[in-house]
Structures are given as structure tokens and as C-alpha cells.
Amino acid sequence: MANILLLDNIDSFTYNLVEQLRNQKNNVLVYRNTVSIDIIFNSLKKLTHPILMLSPGPSLPKHAGCMLDLIKKVKGDIPIVGICLGHQAIVEAYGGIIGYAGEIFHGKASLIRHDGLEMFEGVPQPLPVARYHSLICNKIPEKFVINSYFEKMIMSVRNNCDRVCGFQFHPESILTTHGDQILEKIIHWASLKYITNKKQ
């Protein structure tokens, strides 16, 4: 079980994600991105080994309330998982570049290629995933690796040192055939931040 604080970017997928995480026996707190950073940060500090999760949402990362500033405040100290808009915000907060995909993907299933490591270990290759987005990551930040693609589009990234990862696709969608398994692996991978820190 993990202690997860989910930042809600006011999206219809948020509570699908909450339900999936709670079904996996995780403790989940939800705050909207309109809540002040101080309140959210104080809640994170009260949790044992917290994970910050950033939900999907509309628009651009810079228009998503406190999200970018919150990432910058906790990165390196608290593991972060971003989905769709949350993924884009992680890339931007760490210095990467986000741009338009050239077309809108709304409820589209695509077959992605992945590296078969960490959260993708033991899942099919290629992997069917759900996509709802018009933005993509054009340039990844330093210390991040690309761990999945659709054609030439970046579909996910991870930073093994900070235990920060982002997914352009939706693991919580029924169109992502192994989404529940992937989400469990994501939470396990993020939680290793605290085990690694103890050894240092």
C-alpha cells in the first residue's frame, strides 16, 4: 500500500484513476490544482513515504493551477507520477519542451513500443494504450530516458534518480489493456525512492 496525493487537474478521468488506485489498496488523498501549494505541501509532509500523482486535464501545463510550481517545489524529494497533462507538466518543469502533436487524439487506441523495463516489464510488445491528447513532448529533460514511443512520438519518460515518471497515455482507461498491471508497477517503482534513499 502506498500513500498517494493526487492532484486533480479537473478532468473526467480523475476519479477513474482514484478508484483504480484504491482498488489496489492504496491510500489516496485528492486536491484540486486550485488549492494553494502550502496546503498541498503540508499534506504531503504528513504522509509516510508519499507519492505525488498528477492527473490528466485540459489545456496547457502553465494553465493547470499550482501544478508546475508544486512539481518544482518537491522534485528530487518526493516521487512524482504524471499522466497525460501531468506527464507534460513534469517534462516542462524539468526543462523539456512540449509542443502540439499536429492532430487531436481523443479516445484513440494505439500500439506503442516500450523498453520492457520497470513499469513495462512483463507486458505485451507492442502494447495497446488509450490516448486523449493534442500536446506531446518534443524534447526530454536531462536525466530522463524515453521508455515508450508511438512511431516517433514520445509516450512515456522516467528519471530513475528522482523516481519521477510521466505517461502520455492513460493507464486507467479500459483501452489500455494492461493498465492495472502497469499502474501497480508504477507505484512500486516510485516507492523505491525511499528504499534507495535509506541505502545512501
From Swiss-Prot:
It catalyses: chorismate + L-glutamine = anthranilate + pyruvate + L-glutamate + H(+). Its EC number is 4.1.3.27. GO terms for molecular function: anthranilate phosphoribosyltransferase activity; anthranilate synthase activity. The active site is at 84 (nucleophile), 170 (for gatase activity), 172 (for gatase activity). Transmembrane segments: none annotated. Pathway: Amino-acid biosynthesis; L-tryptophan biosynthesis; L-tryptophan from chorismate: step 1/5. One of its GO terms (cellular component) is cytosol. Heterotetramer consisting of two non-identical subunits: a beta subunit (TrpG) and a large alpha subunit (TrpE). This is Anthranilate synthase component 2.
